[in-house]
Structure formats: structure tokens, C-alpha cells
Amino acid sequence: MFSISRITRTSSFTTQFRALYRFKHSARKLQSIPFSIYKKMSAADRLNQTHDILSESVQAVENPFKVTVIGSGNWGTTISKVVAENAALRPHLFVKRVDMWVFEETVDGQKLTEIINTKHQNVKYLPNIDLPENLVANPDLVSAVKDADILVFNIPHQFLPRIVSQLQGNIKKDARAISCLKGFDVSKDGVKLLSTYVTEKLGITCGALSGANLAPEVAKENWSETTVAYELPKDFKGEGKDVDHAVLKALFHRPYFHVNVIDDVAGISVAGALKNVVALGCGFVEGLGWGNNASAAIQRVGLGEIIKFGQMFFPDSRVETYYQESAGVADLITTCSGGRNVRVATHMAKTGKSAEECEKELLNGQSAQVFTHVRRSTSGWPSAVRPMNSFCSRPFTRLSTRTLLWTLCQT
């Protein structure tokens, strides 16, 4: 539920005032429910009631926002489900139809988009999860984004340059975006956030979403929380006319998926990218049978390295984000406990196979988000490991798994 403590972490006095007003308004409505009725409600019913009241407190906009999700993997489809549910419930804020761009594939002789639009399930990447009927799978990227006011990027980050190049000149000039991608744009000029890359290439303001969000659990509507970071642009049109924190909360918040909106885009982006390197170490620990104590040490050292990295390359990022937000330590714990990176690293340690081989065996066509290239050495262990969407203070070159873990633990 919305709390006073979280109001203090918003970006401006005006935002704080509005958040406090909405909180008081919602509290009054909750108090109006007779206790005899409230005590009979299940926990899920209470979450739904609170969710509905909070959403009603968001001011209607002049023109409802059209939302498009770019990406349809397991996480992309899950976020599309969340967004489409909210779009259907809030016609005063969003256009009911939500487009989800799908890279067209054939599954059992039928186009994946046709399956999604008729059976309302993504049978390849998110099977056995029912999707809202107002979620439309669209294989034409330009068609999917042309009228969108809010773009939600949720694709493997290595495809971002190609996608962005196709979007140039084909989106609204005043569109806003949220990136669910994990990683950095690294060049000779330095390190950039992927949200910054989107802003520079498309000329639109882009925030980020990250948190302790294993896609299958969110899709099954197990209770989860996440963090959305968005800094209001200089050309902000005003409340009711443009995307702000309240609109983003209404877009992503569900009774089973609680959202906190802040403005530290760098903080949650750094945490979301570098957690995967730490998860790699935890997977090797598990595969070698070193136990939970060693895994905890990897996570402790890893969190410290993440914070140092953030302070070095993005000095405006806030240390408290790593500790207080779902995108920080909570996401690190979740990813190191059961994410795809842990599974791949564990399998590598147990079998001596390359990352590519393990990905093919375990991930149904998806990537582990950690490697770009792994060469097999004569001993069977990776002879060159280069992080794909994040990196550490030391190169992973010609290291056995045990040496790699030792390197991770040195500070």
C-alpha cells in the first residue's frame, strides 16, 4: 500500500504535495468502508480495493495515452499483460487497445501473432498464461508504434540499435518511453544508460523499470513489487496533459504488482544491469556445490561493487536506491536465487559446456543476458568470457570457473 515514507523520495515539492493529496484522498475512501465488511475481505480483496481506490485518485487526462510494448519474450509478454489490464480498467487515462510488437515466428505451422490474437496466449515464451483480449500482437513494428504516446521497450538489449533505427521518424515527437532492458551502451566515449541511448537516438524522454521481478511469478500474479524511474522532461506539458509519476504508477501498478515511482533512472539501471554478473558467480557456486555461505559472500561483494560502479560512472545515482528499492538489493537476491543467469552458470559449472550450449538447452531461444562470446578451451571451461550487458572492475579472460569466483570475491 502507498506509504508516507515513500512520498519523501519523490523529485520535487509539487510532486510531493500531489502524492500526499492522493494518499489522504485514498485513505479517506478506505476509511469509508464499514469495518464489518472490511474484516470479511480476503487479503487479495483488500489489495484489489486499495488498488482501485488509488487508481481513481489519478486525474483524468485530456487525451488518453496510447501504449505500445516493444517485445514479446516472457518478460515482454508479462509486462504487456500488466499494461493491457490497466488500460482496460482506466479509460480516463489510456486507450483500451495495447499493441505488443512481436518478432514473427512460426509455432507448429502457425504464426505466433495469430496464436496470440486468437488463443490469447504466448504459447512459446509464456505458455499457460491467459492474456487480455485488448492486447493485440502486431508483427509490424512501424504500425505498432505510429500512434503510441508511451513506448515500453522490452527486448533483448542487443537488438536495441536495430529497433531504434527502425523507429526513427516513425514515432510521435512528444512520445515518452520506459525501458525494461538491462545493460549499458559502452563505447570509446564512455558508459551510457540504455534509456539515455533511446533518448539520444529518438529525441524522446525515456525512464526505466526494474525490480525483483521473475517473469513467470508476475505472470501467475504472485505478489511482487518493482521500481519505475522517470525524470520529468524540461518540456513537460503539465498534469493531465503529459506522462508523469502518477500516470506511470497507474499504467504498471496491479494488485499483485506493486510499483514505486522515483526519479533515479541511473540508480535502478546500474543495479538492474550489474546484478547479472553477480548472478553468474552465484550460479558457478551452486554448480560447484560450494553452498549458501559462499553464495551469500558473492552477493555481499557484488552489491558493494555495484554501488562503487554507480558512483564512479553515474555520480548522480543515489546510494539509497540500491538498498531501499526493489530494483536494488531485492532484485539482486531474487536474480541470484532463481534467474536464468544462475541456471546457465550452474549448468556450465556442472557440465563444462559453453554458455551458448547451455542457453540452447535451457532457455528455449532466449539469452542469459551475461555473455556475448564464450570460447571453449581444451579443458572444457570457457577460455574467454566477456560480459554482454554489464561489466566488472576486472576482465574475465582465460579464467577457470574457480578462478573467476576468486576474482569476484577480491575487493
UniProtKB/Swiss-Prot annotation:
Q: Provide the family line.
A: Belongs to the NAD-dependent glycerol-3-phosphate dehydrogenase family.
Q: Which UniProt keywords apply?
A: NAD, Oxidoreductase
* Name recorded for this polypeptide: Glycerol-3-phosphate dehydrogenase [NAD(+)]
Could you say which EC number(s) this protein's record lists? Answer: 1.1.1.8
PROSITE patterns the UniProt entry points to: NAD_G3PDH (PS00957)
- Cellular component GO terms, alphabetical: cytosol; nucleus
Q: Name one GO biological process term.
A: glycerol-3-phosphate catabolic process
Q: Where does NAD(+) bind?
A: 71-76, 103, 159, 215, 340, 369
PANTHER family membership = GLYCEROL-3-PHOSPHATE DEHYDROGENASE, GLYCEROL-3-PHOSPHATE DEHYDROGENASE [NAD(+)]-RELATED
Q: Which GO terms describe its molecular function?
A: glycerol-3-phosphate dehydrogenase (NAD+) activity; NAD binding; protein homodimerization activity
Active site per UniProt: 275 (proton acceptor)
EC category name: oxidoreductase
Catalytic reaction(s) noted: sn-glycerol 3-phosphate + NAD(+) = dihydroxyacetone phosphate + NADH + H(+)
- UniProt: substrate binding residues: 182, 340-341
User: Could you tell me the superkingdom of the organism this chain comes from?
Assistant: Eukaryota
Q: Quick check: keyword NAD in the entry? A: yes
